Curated annotation (Swiss-Prot):
It is found in: Nucleus; Cytoplasm; Endoplasmic reticulum. Residues 147-249 are annotated as: Disordered. The lineage of its organism: Eukaryota, Metazoa, Chordata, Craniata, Vertebrata. This is Acidic leucine-rich nuclear phosphoprotein 32 family member A. The keyword Repressor applies. Belongs to the ANP32 family. Residues 123-161 form the LRRCT domain. Residues 157-230 have a biased composition (Acidic residues). It comes from Bos taurus (Bovine).
Length: 249
């Protein structure tokens, strides 16, 4: 896929000014130049063009907010002064796997005052004597070269993964906020259901009590009727002897 078509695809109906991260890896650049990328991408902070066949960065637009640039596995051999002009706030630059042979090629990077991390893995320049020491002298603003500082301590976030992880963290935070909101809605619905169930239980409990009370009343009435019946029979038995006595007279 051509680079300009890939850019159009990556936009996903967004405007260029809405894009902060753009990954164009493994697409095809015509004549080894950047194409389809304009200065309308004014908010772009991360650009990756790994293995796209670049031989030059001359067509790079003005990207003042760009902090991380991935150019690894291309055929770039020079012309890096363009980076200082077009991406003045660059902090991470990966040129691994390009045709950089000597220190003079990377000397223009001195103008990138904010550059903290530079990667030159698999470039011929890394075979020079005292390569690391000389690069740190040439670019004193650097903190990490090929993932390690001057004291050979590894960078906390290998290469520029830290920046990408930062973007991912932001997305995760948004997802968590959305999840929390959804969870709260579910909890509220569950609370409402529990309240309704509680009310139903109260109502059914009252009905049961009323039924029990009604039944108790029926039992009491039956007992009263039985007692009355016994009394009446007793009175009849008393009257019968009396009646017999009167007959004798």
């Amino acid at each position: 896929m051509d680079m300009d078509k890939r850019i159009h695809l990556e936009l996903r109906n967004r405007t260029p000014s809405d894009v902060k991260e753009l990954v164009l890896d493994n697409c095809r650049s015509n004549e080894g130049k950047i194409e389809g990328l304009t200065d309308e991408f004014e908010e772009l902070e991360f650009l990756s063009t790994i293995n796209v066949g670049l031989t030059s960065v001359a067509n790079l637009p003005k990207l003042n907010k760009l902090k991380k640039l991935e150019l690894s596995d291309n055929r770039i051999s020079g012309g890096l002064e363009v980076l200082a002009e077009k991406c003045p706030n660059l902090t991470h630059l990966n040129l691994s796997g390009n045709k950089i042979k000597d220190l003079s090629t990377i000397e223009p990077l001195k103008k990138l005052e904010n550059l903290k991390s530079l990667d030159l893995f698999n470039c011929e320049v890394t075979n020079l004597n005292d390569y690391r020491e000389n690069v740190f002298k040439l670019l004193p603003q650097l903190t990490y070269l090929d993932g390690y500082d001057r004291d050979d301590k590894e960078a906390p976030d290998s290469d520029a993964e830290g920046y990408v992880e930062g973007l991912d963290d932001d997305e995760e935070d948004e997802d968590e906020e959305e999840y929390d909101e959804d969870a709260q809605v579910v909890e509220d619905e569950e609370d409402e259901e529990e309240e309704e169930e509680g009310e139903e239980e109260d109502v059914s409990g009252e009905e049961e009590e009323d039924e029990e009370g009604y039944n108790d009343g029926e039992v009491d009435d039956e007992e009263d009727e039985e007692e009355l019946g016994e009394e009446e029979r007793g009175q009849k038995r008393k009257r019968e002897p009396e009646d017999e006595g009167e007959d004798d007279d």
